[in-house]
């Protein structure tokens, strides 16, 4: 076990203030060449599909007051400025500002690298604002708690007794029946998988964890279709988007081995579809690649 007392770091995790565990994102690991390569691919997708882009900052860039003194972290604000300049302001969803405004609220888990349902809600509002949509009126005061003993990926890495997180969701997302198909085979009638709450991977509660391809049919907005290219940050926000679309297709490029544009053309309806790229900044750099 590597422990650096000055930075309060264990195995790539900062031991932050207020019991926050924050993943270490070393600035030296994310080169300008890597940034430019990912942004070039993103611009190609945006130009072809008129896509919207939401790259979510990780906790180290928003909860800076929780970081140990002098702890280095990758500057995602600089990356986001490059992305915005490349894809154009109309395609760029500024979730950074939305999260920064609510940094004093529990928008990230303390023991996991994801944002919470509250964080995803603020992302949803930023998306609606960019799209010119009146957002479905979810009630943050009415969020339902399904677990109070979640210990996420960062907790697993430090292997030290720490704190426990609460997992919540918006019960309004269950107001209408849905039909969900995972990986062209398995079907479900919910956007949630409560069986994951009995496992170590409790975040899998959202959208039944990660899958190469998900097809969602809702009782909302006939004729409206959304295609999402994403990492796991999207799993807790997609249920909030369901009230705005009849059909949502979701692809995770980490597990999908086919040709992305060919898949999108296959599922695009005659009237067209909205396209959303939704990643956290670090996984965008590490995983955003398609053929």
Stretches found by the model and what they are:
Residues 1-291:
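Extracellular glycan-modifying ectodomains
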């Amino acid at each position: 076990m590597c422990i650096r007392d000055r930075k309060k770091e264990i195995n790539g995790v900062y031991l932050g203030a207020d019991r926050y565990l924050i993943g270490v994102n070393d600035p030296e690991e994310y080169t300008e060449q890597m940034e430019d390569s990912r942004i070039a691919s993103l611009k190609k997708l945006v130009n072809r599909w008129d896509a919207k882009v939401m790259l979510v900052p990780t906790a180290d860039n928003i909860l800076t007051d929780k970081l140990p003194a002098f702890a280095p972290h990758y500057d995602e604000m600089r990356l986001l400025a490059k992305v915005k300049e490349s894809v154009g302001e109309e395609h760029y969803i500024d979730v950074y500002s939305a999260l920064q405004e609510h940094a004093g609220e529990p928008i990230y888990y303390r023991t996991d690298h994801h944002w919470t349902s509250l964080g995803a809600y603020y992302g949803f509002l930023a998306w609606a604002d960019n799209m010119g949509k009146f957002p479905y009126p979810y009630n943050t005061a009415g969020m339902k708690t399904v677990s109070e003993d979640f210990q996420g990926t960062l907790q697993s890495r430090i292997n030290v007794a720490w704190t426990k997180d609460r997992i919540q969701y918006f019960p309004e997302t269950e107001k209408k029946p849905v039909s969900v198909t995972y990986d062209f085979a398995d079907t479900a009638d919910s956007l949630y998988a409560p069986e994951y709450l009995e496992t170590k991977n409790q975040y899998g509660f959202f959208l039944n964890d990660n899958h190469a391809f998900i097809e969602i049919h809702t009782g909302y907005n006939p004729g409206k279709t959304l295609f999402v290219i994403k990492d796991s940050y999207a799993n807790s926000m997609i249920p909030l988007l369901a009230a705005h679309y009849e059909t949502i297709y979701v692809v995770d490029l980490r597990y999908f081995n086919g040709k992305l544009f060919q898949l999108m053309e296959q599922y695009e309806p005659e009237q067209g579809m909205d396209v959303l790229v939704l990643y956290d900044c670090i996984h965008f750099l590490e995983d955003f690649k398609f053929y």
